[in-house]
């Protein structure tokens, strides 16, 4: 069976698995963005906390995904739970780093002007600092989206949803019928999903960034 025939024959399953993976990644990305922005907003004025947050992000990104998933499986068991926790954890790291950097590099004269107008700390954060840092934040979100789309494939090994199952199914019967087709379908499907997600996030970034600071 050719690769195209394999795709046509299993199109319903492949579409379902693609939708599963895309949904899982997007939901984890939304949760991670909220957590990362809140944490960054709490720590960005404290140099020690900023250093700790960026160091944690750097160290966290070095953790092998298989090792983290294995640890989570030991605690939560197989299934979607360890996959969601791992994806959310990895997604938080680039967003947290970028948000902290973005907030810390906002022009201090803008903050001083806002304070002179009598704005509260929270109002300055939401009306001045966060909008100015938003392009940097969204750059982190795009990095996280591409990264966890790939991690999501590995998460299928512990019972996570998505196209990773096709890859592992093909690898498990390497040399057998349709093994290569299965592996290629999963790999190319994930690459396509990552591209689609990045384009969507680019659109969201442009729509939510103030016109005056769009690049």
Task: Give the positions of each predicted feature.
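Short cytoplasmic-facing helical segments at TM-TM junctions of multi-pass membrane proteins
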Residues: 98-138
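Generic alpha-helical transmembrane segments of integral inner-membrane proteins
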Residues: 22, 26, 30-38, 42, ...
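Loop-to-helix entry region at the N-terminal start of transmembrane alpha-helices
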Residues: 13-24, 73-94, 134, 182-186
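Periplasmic/extracellular loop-to-transmembrane helix junction in inner-membrane transport proteins
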Residues: 1-29, 169-172, 176-177
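Cytoplasmic-entry segments and transmembrane alpha-helices of multi-pass inner-membrane transporters
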Residues: 39-72, 87, 95-101
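Short cytosolic juxtamembrane segments of multi-pass membrane proteins
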Residues: 205-215
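Hydrophobic alpha-helical transmembrane segments of polytopic membrane proteins
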Residues: 163-204
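Transmembrane alpha-helices
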Residues: 26, 89, 121-155, 185
């Amino acid at each position: 069976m050719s690769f195209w025939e394999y795709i046509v024959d299993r199109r319903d399953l492949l579409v379902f698995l693609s939708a599963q993976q895309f949904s899982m990644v997007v939901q984890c990305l939304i949760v991670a963005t909220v957590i990362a922005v809140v944490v960054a907003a709490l720590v960005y004025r404290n140099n020690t906390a900023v250093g700790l947050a960026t160091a944690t992000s750097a160290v966290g990104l070095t953790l092998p995904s298989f090792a983290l998933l294995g640890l989570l499986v030991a605690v939560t068991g197989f299934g979607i739970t360890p996959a969601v926790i791992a994806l959310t954890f990895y997604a938080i790291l680039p967003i947290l780093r970028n948000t902290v950097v973005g907030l810390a590099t906002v022009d201090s004269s803008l903050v001083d002007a806002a304070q002179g107008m009598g704005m509260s700390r929270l109002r300055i954060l939401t009306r001045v600092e966060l909008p100015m840092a938003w392009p940097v934040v969204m750059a982190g979100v795009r990095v996280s989206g591409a990264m966890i789309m790939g991690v999501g494939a590995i998460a299928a090994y512990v019972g996570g949803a998505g196209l990773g199952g096709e890859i592992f199914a093909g690898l498990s019967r390497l040399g057998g019928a349709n093994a290569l087709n299965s592996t290629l379908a999963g790999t190319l499907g994930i690459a396509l999903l990552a591209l689609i997600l990045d384009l969507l996030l680019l659109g969201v970034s442009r729509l939510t960034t103030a016109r005056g600071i769009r690049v």
